[in-house]
UniProtKB/Swiss-Prot annotation:
Keyword Amino-acid biosynthesis in record: no
Family listed: Belongs to the universal ribosomal protein uL30 family.
HAMAP family with a match to the protein in the record: Ribosomal_uL30_B
Pfam families, A to Z: Ribosomal_L30
Protein name as annotated: Large ribosomal subunit protein uL30
Keyword Ribonucleoprotein in annotation: yes
NCBIfam families xref list: rpmD_bact
PANTHER family listed in its UniProt record: LARGE RIBOSOMAL SUBUNIT PROTEIN UL30M, MITOCHONDRIAL RIBOSOMAL PROTEIN L30
Subunit structure: Part of the 50S ribosomal subunit.
SUPFAM superfamilies attached to this UniProt entry: Ribosomal protein L30p/L7e
One GO MF term: structural constituent of ribosome
Organism, scientific name: Bordetella avium (strain 197N)
């Protein structure tokens, strides 16, 4: 069975955010504003998304 995937898009700038939140965004593979990545839906990724939920949008890939 194929693993579930999610699409993550950075919709707010990381300027003025905590360094740990900036590091989390980079860890998700997001660089500039409106950049997107398709990631495998794992508990680790979900935890990272929960930490920066005010900066990103999540949709099914």
């Amino acid at each position: 069975m194929a693993q579930k995937q999610i699409k993550v898009t950075l919709v707010r700038s990381v300027i003025g955010t905590k360094q740990s939140h900036r590091d989390t965004v980079r860890g998700l593979g997001l660089r500039g504003l409106n950049s997107s990545r398709v990631l495998i839906d794992t508990p680790e990724v979900r935890g990272m998304l929960r930490k920066v939920d005010y900066l990103v949008t999540v949709s099914e890939a």
